[in-house]
A protein has these predicted regions:
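Short secondary-structure capping/turn micro-motifs that flank functional sites
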Residues: 7-9, 109-110
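Conserved alpha/beta catalytic core and glycan-binding cleft of carbohydrate-active enzymes
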Residues: 10-11, 16-23, 27-47, 125-126, ...
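Asparagine-centered polar/low-complexity signal
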Residues: 6-7, 76, 161
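Active-site-adjacent "subsite" loops/lids of carbohydrate-active enzymes
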Residues: 11-96, 106
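Active-site neighborhood of glycoside hydrolase catalytic domains
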Residues: 71-146
Length: 192
């Protein structure tokens, strides 16, 4: 099953309720997650922190992060409540007999934070393995081989190696040059 933990739809009830709540705050008033727990589910800010931050609908005082697009707000995966939500998602699918997840956009959970992303992956993978010892996880980390190799610290058993199959990737280069040793050396980077 493909699991998109990085973001939700801008139409998701968590996001729409959080936006309605923020739009109703008075200028300078801080959000209270005991009043609206969903304000902690996303990366909201009272200032536009970069080009991936968009105005909260109905508010000129609040912004949210959407790394891929304004219609896909980023979830706050450091939030224990969000982590619990994904444990419930895992429970649902594992109880139905699913024995593996493809983790979408794993390197974007927290931007430029490999260690934090590895912790997030490890926590969910460990949870799933406790539910099903045969559980398998593969993570999408669309990056260089060196960055992908760093993500193995998460304990996740497999990462996609998109670069290996590109026109200039290790697989194509090995075939073009008749040099299988270069392919083996490229793959060994993941082992070490």
């Amino acid at each position: 099953i493909d699991v998109a933990m990085n973001h939700s739809s801008s139409q998701h009830p968590w996001f729409t309720q959080a936006c309605e709540y923020l739009a109703g705050l008075k200028a300078g008033e801080k959000p209270d997650d005991t009043v609206c727990p969903y304000v902690d589910y996303y990366h909201f800010s009272d200032k536009q922190e970069g080009t991936t931050y968009y105005a909260v609908p109905g508010s000129s005082s609040w912004w949210y992060e959407g790394s891929f697009w304004s219609e896909m707000p980023d979830l706050n995966l450091k939030s224990p409540a969000v982590q619990k939500e994904f444990e419930e998602v895992a429970d649902y699918w594992i109880d139905l007999g699913v024995d593996g997840f493809r983790m979408d956009a794993a390197m974007h959970y927290e931007e430029n934070a490999t260690n934090a992303n590895c912790d997030i992956l490890n926590k969910l993978y460990t949870y799933c393995k406790e539910k099903n010892p045969q559980f398998y996880m593969v993570s999408e980390v669309w990056a260089s081989e060196n960055v992908i190799a760093d993500y193995y610290a998460s304990g996740t058993p497999s990462m996609f190696n998109f670069d290996a199959g590109t026109a200039k990737g290790a697989l194509v280069n090995a075939v073009r040059k008749g040099d299988p040793v270069s392919l083996v050396n490229s793959m060994l980077k993941y082992q070490n």
